[in-house]
Amino acid sequence: MKVNIEIAGLPLYKTFGKTKKIAFEFPGKTLKELIDAMVRKFGFEVKKFLLNNNGDIDMDIRVLLNGATYLSENRMQTSLNDGDALIFKAPS
């Protein structure tokens, strides 16, 4: 599956090859599987800036799905579809 990812206000610019937007292909269907694949590909920086100590997305990070829905409860279990757009935003 391929999703489009945008990072807003998080220091992952260098990690993602000096860009804030990437198309990312991964084997999975949930946000957890996406994050796991991102950590495998990009390393500790992704884990450091997106996840809390329990391995969940830090509640201070806002996750916007397809420009319309802010994910809140059980975010890691959110189902994704091919072509979805995700924005990870730092707290304001």
Which residues fall in each region the model found?
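Ubiquitin-like/PB1-type beta-grasp interaction modules and other compact soluble beta-rich domains
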Residues: 1-92
